[in-house]
Amino acid sequence: MKEIYADSKNISVGSFAYQRSDQVHALATNNLDFVVDPIIPRSDEINSEKVFEDDFVVMYREGHDLSKIKDVSVDDILDQKHLHVSNRRRGLHLIDTELEKIGYRREVALRCQHFLIAPTIIQSTDLVLMGTRSFANRNNLPFAETPLDIPSMEYFLIWHKNDEGDGGHIWMKDLIVRAFKHAQR
């Protein structure tokens, strides 16, 4: 936001959830300028650029039993109670889908709607969180590597092709891309 306001004090930025099925239309009608999502809509009307990729780790509090294990196994992870972060009431996470492929299931003891509360929950309970390495580092959460072959978490910046030549759109796109690169450090 600092960079945005340094160059343009009259700009307004919003961030909110949108139905995936409505994204292409919302981009085409300029109801949305950009979408950041792990799934690129199937449409010839949009362009995208990968802005984030990170591998999964298992996070826990200081002194947790997992911190005492040198090479954490799948069973070690699955023996734990998990925190699941999702804005949906039910449904699987990418991690759960990958676990099911190899015949495993984790015990989700608590679901919360946002990652903002996750560090406090992890630091004050015995729950573990499977999330990205950058999230663990940014929140100073101890973590272990996962022995699971889980695809990396990827997010894409998505925009409508009609906006390709717009100077303001190009400027904002470049700011967003730089912000994601900075966030992964």
What are these regions (language model features)?
Residues 19-20, 36-41, 61-62, 114, ...:
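Beta->alpha turn/N-cap motifs
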Residues 43-82, 167-170:
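Flexible hinge/capping segments at coil-to-helix
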Residues 1-9, 92-105:
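Ligand-binding cleft/hinge of the Venus flytrap
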Residues 1-43, 112:
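Central regulatory/effector-binding core of bacterial HTH transcription factors
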Residues 44-50, 54-55, 116-164:
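Beta-alpha-beta core module
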Residues 66-67, 80-102, 165-173, 183:
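Secondary-structure junction motif
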Residues 2, 158-185:
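Extended ligand-binding regions for polar small-molecule ligands
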Residues 11, 27-36, 56, 104, ...:
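Alpha-to-beta junction loops
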